[in-house]
Amino acid sequence: AGLEQFYRHRHLGVTLEATDVCRRLLELWGPTIDAEGMTFESAEAECALQQQAAGLVTAYLAHAPADEKPLAVEVATQAQLFDPMTGEDLGIPLVGIIDLIVGGQDGAVIADFKTSARSSEPLEIFHELQLTSYSYLFRQLSGKTEAGLEIRSLVKTKTPKIEFHGYPARTDVHFRRFFAVVREYLDALDAGRFNYRPGFHCGMCDFATSHCREWGA
């Protein structure tokens, strides 16, 4: 929420100081926690997380380029899925929210924010489908090719660290893999094959306590 506020103001030509961003972060804390239904072990635990969040935001703003120009911030996007290799309409839209698009020397750079517990070079394959989906949405809606993509990591170490990891524009290889995965997913739905793959996404699934409990029983 804090970085969204910073970049929305920057998009309007207003640069907020880190203290202002942290203040807005804390003002939005309560409503955001209520909306997400989050709970804490104690008031002290919640206060510690607030301080951690403010520290990460402050470190990020000190690290980010001072002259960075946001083109779009926290933008909800949707585009019909057309296989770029064949032109086939897959009959469903791709829906996503892109954290940030900034103007670079060679064109637009698509950035996604992540938090992590430790510093490390992220495996590109781990983020490949997400980055490719953002690239697809950007190209469909803008008619342009991105200059690159970034994972911007806010590392929750004792002294907060900020790491930017850049990746090149997506290629035909990326899109072939992406659409192969989409087709596999659609084929599985059509055939009624619902494989048991528990993970963090289960918390967002309507079938976590019903169909999945019955799978393989």
Task: Please name every model-derived segment.
Residues G2-D83:
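A non-catalytic, helix-rich entry segment at domain boundaries
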Residues F40-E44, L61-H63, T86-D89, R118-P122, ...:
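Short helix-to-loop capping/linker segments positioned immediately adjacent to catalytic or ligand/cofactor-binding
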Residues A72-L141:
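Non-catalytic protein-protein interaction segments used by genome-maintenance enzymes to assemble
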Residues E36, I110, K114-S116, V181-L189:
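Short amphipathic alpha-helical segments and their helix-coil junctions
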Residues A1, Q5, G55, A59, ...:
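Residue-level signal for well-ordered alpha-helical scaffold segments within enzymatic catalytic domains
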Residues L3, A53, L100, Y134, ...:
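A residue-level signal for conserved active-site and pocket-lining positions in enzyme catalytic cores
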Residues T19, P122-E124, L137-A217:
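Metal-dependent nuclease catalytic regions and adjoining charged, substrate-binding loops involved
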Residues A1, Q51-A54, L129-T132, G199-G203:
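Non-catalytic, well-ordered alpha-helical scaffold segments
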